[in-house]
Amino acid sequence: MGKLLTKVLANRMQFDAAAYSLLHDGQCGGVRKHATIDAGIVLLDFINTSRERGWHTSVCAIDVAQFFPSLNHAAVTRVLAKLGFAKTLTNLMASYFIDRQTVYRWDSATSDPFDFSFGTPQGDCLSPIISALFLSVAIKHVFPPSLTPKSTRCLFFVNDGALYTASPSLATNVRVLSAHLLSLLIALANIGLAIELSKTELIHFFAFQLSASSQSLARTHQPSLTFRWNDEDFVIKPSNVWRYLGFFFTPTLDWTYHVHYYTNKGFSSVRACSMLGNSIRGIGPKQRALGYQACILPVLTYGSALWHAPQGVGVIKHVKHMERVHSFAMGWITGTFRTTPIGARGVIAGIPPLCIILDLRFCGYQVRLTTLDDRHICRTTWSHRWINPRIRDVRPRTRPRHLPSDNPLERLATDAVREQFFPFHASSRPGDRLLDLFPHRISIDAYSPKKGSTLFKAWLSDLAKSITLLHSSTRTIIYSDGAYWNKTARGAYSFTVFRDNRWQDFFGWCPAGSSFDAEIVAIEEAVQWACIQNINDPIFFINNKAALSSFLDTRVRPSQMATIRISEILKDRLINSRSSFSFRYCPSHSGIDGNDHADRLTKRGTALAPVTPPRLLLSDFINDYTKRMTIHWRVLFTSRSFKGQQWLPIRRQKKVFKPAVRNKASTNFFFELSGNDIVLLSRMARAITNHAPTGDYRRRFLPDLEQHCPACPQHAQTRTHVLFHCSRYSPLHTSLTNWCHDRNNSKLWKTFFQRNTTAFTFGDLPDDVH
């Protein structure tokens, strides 16, 4: 219960701190909706904006020593009270930190308990937000918030800080940083904190030579940072490589070191995965693909938003270097040879090429930027681009037009999303959400057994009986439905009402980027109608589980404003009446008359939509980007140099298989075809690419070895011979041409490998090769 209570308090304090701007703009750690990449982007924006106009940038990195254990409890409570938190909360914090004890255990030996009533527990839910609020006092004293940003600023991620400034001279930068560093040391000392001066670092970023004809850097002498503190002189020498929050910066902003570091780290991780299995044993290929995408890709692509550009323009050398890790991982997942084309391996594993993965992550950060609050440091940096008046009229030295900007914020900014988001709306505040206020007057039942199971049939029968009883009662029953047609990009909603033994129909079109968006609109329209009509205790049947589970979730997500409107409408109704609302799941196309009728109304609503509906929503942006990436992958797949010269056209659902991005059916096709068996998948992959232990493979790569079939010495052991003519195996089909045109050739393919367990294995090799 104690941990649950601290989590509740932490969520409330995080929300209030962000909603009321209680923290310094430069604080990115321990704060909701902030990440390390935010700090990196803001810093790079400052560096690029300055150096394009001929100003050098200098950064001083600091580390607050013993941060969590050094927080003074009395000072913490005073800070919370000063910031406006309730007295009950400050009193709770004061009592929460006292009378704490801890013990140390070494094997079976346990120490006596001793007092631990100082600082904040580092793993506690409250520690990040309390420490951030406490530290903000000192930061605001040295870097006070103002409408006009200063030439010298700071960033803090928990206790890792960075002071940065820009000017025409590095010597000026050093003097300014020294003065601000001393001011910060004094401010931190006043609240009982100190900087670990031995970890202080300095780095200079060179500006462009504005007088040069080409984009060249003005490399100049790099002075050291000197200051005096506690009667001791300190000299901080500039570094050639600076690591901050996992990003590696150099004075020239060359990302080679960063990319090489994470490529090596990813390579070490993926090579260690060999302990989990190889081509004949170990975990299944589906689990391998999941592990690679969950554990290794995030490491390999960490910080890619800082340097990557769409389609890899201008950074191809970095992408090529990282592809070595991706290629090795695809071979481990599929059990194929090193000579197998990497494109074919990725298609079989259901994982796109690395260039597409980087583009998708780039898109993901674009999406994140559009959903941030207007007061977020990334949004304010972009919306209110402040340039020092001394260099405002200087023509920036930018990259050639055919190359993307050096500034990641300019690359990431997009105006394609016009949907509005409100991260800190009052209805999103923990404790003030609709289900927090009226938990017993709103009923949501999204349960249903798995479709096709015996339990589902019994459950559906009981649901139909309960609906029949409801129809004979006096309650108002509302069936809602929404639909989105991907090909035409049209969305429609409908709801039908059974009331007083008669039906009332409502339908129309709506902007939508997915079925989820349309379903949320349908629920909103139905709820609004019920409240306007003063319906008491209505019951809603909804055929979309995702919409049913989240239509009152007002967090940032697609259709957030619609969920906020639903919450506000219901809140007003519940405050002014004693009515209750019930929402239940009803599967579509299951023989429920009201649900089927709503589905027909939705199709009528589609006819009202314009020929080219507006595409302004977040879902539209994500769908369009995903489609472009799918097209890109399929264009690559048509190239023989990508998938190999001898790829076989296997079919899925009677159509020639084509890869698709974020499509489960396409991603899992080869895993399901092989039954998630690594031995079977590796044999299939070798055969479909013709990179298998056969005589044909030896002819191309090992010409000195035997190339004839062991079972048929008069014939060369080619893939066609093994599949269709070898006397050792039952044939796949009458001929390769007939198999390629067979609409169910994937089933024949699977049957062949299940019956012929040694086909395309090393067991087929002649004796002189073993």
Regions found by a protein language model. Give the residues of each.
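Conserved pre-catalytic core of RNA-dependent polymerases
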Residues: 1-129, 133, 166
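Catalytic palm active-site di-aspartate
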Residues: 26-30, 57-67, 93, 119-123, ...
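Helix/loop segments that flank and initiate small ligand/metal-binding modules
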Residues: 95, 465-472, 479, 483-487, ...
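Short, conserved micro-motifs composed of acidic
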Residues: 108, 194-240
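RNase H catalytic domain
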Residues: 161, 306-319, 483, 523-600, ...
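Basic, alpha-helical interaction scaffolds
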Residues: 231-308
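RNase H-like nuclease fold core
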Residues: 456-521, 525-536, 552
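Family-specific functional microsites
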Residues: 569-577, 671-770
